[in-house]
Amino acid sequence: MIKLLYPEFWQKRNIIAYLLLSISLIYQFLGYLRASLARPIMLPAKVICVGNCSVGGTGKTQIVMYLAKLLKARNVSFVIVTKAYGSNLKSATTIHQGHTALEAGDEGVILAKYGAVIATKNIKEIVPLINELKPDIIIVDDFLQNPYFHKDFTIVSVDSQRLFGNGFLIPAGPLRQYPNKALDAADLIFLVSSHQDKIPNILTPYVNKLINAQIVPSNNIDKTKNYFAFSGIGNPERFFATLKNYGLNITGYKIFPDHYNYLQADLENLYSLAKEHNATLVTTRKDHVKFNDLNNNIVCLDVELSINNPDLLNEKIFKKAQIFN
């Protein structure tokens, strides 16, 4: 997997974006060819797929966590399927809380706290494991563009600040697919980190299935200290904004590529930077799980999803997925 930072031209078009357009056309053709040749399988349970149209953090993990808690409260059995980004996984594996991020991916380790998790790089490999676990629902994280399985219910996550970037496909832009088709097909659309009342124009046709959501801190952190922040996630700017909105004094920050696997040298450099700033290190849960026993002096900001209209979510999911039939 190529690990990239989110370049500026992905948000605002410049000469680099236009120079890369020819490669984007190849990406588009290969995606069309893949979808045309695919023969989607029916997984042995109803599928809720959570995904996005673009590269970078849009709050998918928090949506999956929210769904897991919702289903657990209703006594609905479920399994979460995740892609195991950044792991050395060779085949589909059932994840437990003893797995490390290198073995299961950072998201797999985090999600294992909420229920049964299968980490895989090939969706077809999960079938035997699903047959063993026999869930009512499969929550699939980040396989929206995968044409090889049937989806009963789809949720598209959109970051309210980045939206769809410059509107170009990878690598000229951040898009995995053009949004209109995905938004039309979606059962629900989450506009994440939306603190404004105005809905972006591109989403106004979908207001009847739009949920405004915020990612908010879920643990208490000492606000009297100075903090040096770092992260290797898809949308680090949102993490830093969350820290500041929480009232923490951030004296500096460092950004790593998404799903970055930290080395001992990185950790030593971070401690040195924190010392220079007379600060304590603070990071995300996705980064924190990668340090194992070395993270005792690193503060972790836990976050969760807060939504403004949970009734719409409940109605659409439990009605269309027919969980209680």
UniProtKB/Swiss-Prot annotation:
Pathway: Glycolipid biosynthesis; lipid IV(A) biosynthesis; lipid IV(A) from (3R)-3-hydroxytetradecanoyl-[acyl-carrier-protein] and UDP-N-acetyl-alpha-D-glucosamine: step 6/6
GO MF entries: ATP binding; tetraacyldisaccharide 4'-kinase activity
GO CC annotation: plasma membrane
One Pfam family cited in the UniProt record for this chain: LpxK
Listed InterPro entries: LpxK, P-loop_NTPase
The keyword Transcription appears for this protein: no
Top EC class, one word: transferase
Residues binding ATP: 54-61
EC number: 2.7.1.130
Keyword Nucleotide-binding recorded: yes
Keywords: ATP-binding, Kinase, Lipid A biosynthesis, Lipid biosynthesis, Lipid metabolism, Nucleotide-binding, Transferase
GO biological process, alphabetically ordered: lipid A biosynthetic process; lipopolysaccharide core region biosynthetic process
Catalytic activity: a lipid A disaccharide + ATP = a lipid IVA + ADP + H(+)
PANTHER family (UniProt xref): TETRAACYLDISACCHARIDE 4'-KINASE, TETRAACYLDISACCHARIDE 4'-KINASE, MITOCHONDRIAL-RELATED
Function: Transfers the gamma-phosphate of ATP to the 4'-position of a tetraacyldisaccharide 1-phosphate intermediate (termed DS-1-P) to form tetraacyldisaccharide 1,4'-bis-phosphate (lipid IVA).
Family that this chain belongs to: Belongs to the LpxK family.
Protein name per the record: Tetraacyldisaccharide 4'-kinase
Organism this protein belongs to: Rickettsia massiliae (strain Mtu5)
